[in-house]
Amino acid sequence: ELLSHEENEELQCHAISTLRNLAASSERNKAAIIDAGAVERIRELVLHAPLSVQSEMTACTAVLALSEDLKPQLLDMGICEVLLPLTDSPSIEVQGNSAAALGNLSSKADDYAPFNAVWDKPAGGLHGYLVRFLESEDTTFQHIAVWTLIQLLESGNHELEQHLRDSPHRLDLGRQVQSRIGTFESEHEQADTSTAADTSGQDVSPEREIAALSRRIEEILFEESDDGTSDAK
């Protein structure tokens, strides 16, 4: 009921933040939160909530979406239908939280039909969101997009793979990926050459990981070219 206190933004934020913290603490709590109907209330309220409340709601959803066992329930509730419009929110936090939730849901899902259902709608759908985030200058957004795209491409769902391959923006996706690789390599080639002997113990940079993931996407998207069925220019 606290989620419904629309006249008190601070109370709503506090209630949802508490739910998020509870969800993060155990799988049992995640299940209890979903069983209590919290996700359904979030779905009903989030699109019309203040930005601060949207931020908390999408962050909570992203945490819940980490559960392998509970993903089917979240997807069956139609949560993607409200997350997708929020990836284009005026708030960077809401955008990032919504995209993170979609990414978590896309990883090792049992059924990818809910992703096919939102391929091009609402608000440009899954495809529009991926293109928008690949074009972003924010490396966190780029990483979420390329990682999510790999989950979808490797899902084994033929219909979803065909959506990606048959998209009129397939070449645009490919060019965005290739651009990320080229930009990263040109900017870091000299530094990598001069410091190669000293980097073995360092963490992989976000840019390097994006480039590595992008190469994998490029391989998958254009693997048909190896069979002599390259895209028309």
Feature-to-residue mapping (PLM):
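Buried hydrophobic core positions in alpha-solenoid tandem helical repeats
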Residues: 1, 41-43, 82-84, 129-131, ...
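Alpha-helical solenoid repeats of the armadillo/HEAT superfamily
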Residues: 7-24, 35-36, 47-66, 73-77, ...
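A positional/structural detector of protein chain ends, strongest at the extreme C-terminus
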Residues: 230-233
